[in-house]
Regions:
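Surface-exposed, low-hydrophobicity beta-strand/loop segments enriched in small/polar/acidic residues
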Residues: 1-128
């Protein structure tokens, strides 16, 4: 996908690894909508583990946060994405195992019973 915001150099730590098993997973590249983000350290970040909704056949169209009755989850964001300057590239987990102990508490609260039902047979949520 085209990096629409240009190339930027930032120094950061290693990304949070939310996978329970890194070998057994399937993920795809997507665009992530700014509206799905939360304010953190002066930036707008969509956190790893956020359930997202979008069209997997039109992944260039920005994915949004999953919502009851209107936007069912089709996957889970694999890594934090900075959307401060608008939609940005991200990775959507569409099949695999998420370790809930590695997802921050605010994001884990978004993984409701409805989200688990929508992702049943695709994404499993476990704790170690």
């Amino acid at each position: 996908m085209l990096n629409k915001s240009g190339i930027k150099k930032e120094t950061a730590g290693a990304p949070t690894q939310i996978l329970f098993n890194v070998q057994n997973q399937m993920s795809v590249s997507i665009q992530v909508a700014k509206a799905a983000g939360v304010a953190e350290g002066g930036k707008t970040i969509v956190k790893a583990g956020t359930p997202l909704n979008g069209d997997l056949t039109a992944r260039g169209t920005a994915f949004v946060a999953a919502a009851d009755n209107t936007a069912p989850a089709v996957g889970v964001l694999l890594h934090d994405v900075d959307v401060s300057n608008g939609p940005a590239n991200g990775t959507l987990l569409i099949w695999g195992f998420v370790n809930l102990n590695r997802v921050d508490s605010a994001t884990a609260a978004k993984i409701t019973a409805n989200r688990k039902t929508e992702l049943a047979g695709k994404v499993w949520f476990l704790k170690d």
